[in-house]
Each structure stands twice: as structure tokens, then as C-alpha cells.
Amino acid sequence: MSLSVEAKAKIVADFGRGTNDSGSSEVQVALLTAQINHLQGHFSEHKKDHHSRRGLLRMVSQRRKLLDYLKRKDVARYTSLIERLGLRR
């Protein structure tokens, strides 16, 4: 259910500040968004998979916390990130 190594590397390259930047808030939010989108497709087929749904809610909560942190620290980076990811906030 996780992302492939190539998909993660592409996200890190697109959103990171450097080639090995996997810890910045932008990269973490982008990785969580990709995993959340993947799980949403999973739940269209497996409606009763409550164990994975709990993991999805945990990921959504973590993404919200990271976005709130980024908004508090640097509003310009926050707005550009939500536009690039297509989030509604």
C-alpha cells in the first residue's frame, strides 16, 4: 500500500530543496498527500477496511499538523505548496 521508491524519489525531487531533502515540510506533506490519494482509491474497492481507514485518518491528521506548522512559519511557502498539490485550504 505504500508508494514505490521511484514515486517517492520523484516527489522528493519535485518538492525538495535538494536531491536528498526528504525531511522538509513540503516534501513530507507531498508524500502524505500521495499516500492519502492512493488509499482513497483503495477504499473505493474495499469499503469495510477499517484498519486501513484508521491509518488514513492518522495521515490526514499528520498532514494537517505539518500544514499548520508551515503556515505559521512561512506563509509564502504554504500558499505555493497548497496550490501545487491542489489542496483546498
From Swiss-Prot:
Molecular function (Gene Ontology), one example: rRNA binding
Record-linked NCBIfam families: S15_bact (TIGR00952)
Functional description taken from the UniProt entry: One of the primary rRNA binding proteins, it binds directly to 16S rRNA where it helps nucleate assembly of the platform of the 30S subunit by binding and bridging several RNA helices of the 16S rRNA. Forms an intersubunit bridge (bridge B4) with the 23S rRNA of the 50S subunit in the ribosome.
A GO CC term assigned to this protein in UniProt: cytosolic small ribosomal subunit
Protein name: Small ribosomal subunit protein uS15
Family statement: Belongs to the universal ribosomal protein uS15 family.
PANTHER family: RIBOSOMAL PROTEIN S15, BACTERIAL AND ORGANELLAR, SMALL RIBOSOMAL SUBUNIT PROTEIN US15M
Domain of life from the UniProt record: Bacteria
Subunit comment: Part of the 30S ribosomal subunit. Forms a bridge to the 50S subunit in the 70S ribosome, contacting the 23S rRNA.
UniProt cross-references to CDD domains, sorted A to Z: Ribosomal_S15p_S13e (cd00353)
Keyword Ribonucleoprotein belongs to the record: yes
Gene Ontology BP terms: translation
Keywords: Ribonucleoprotein, Ribosomal protein, RNA-binding, rRNA-binding
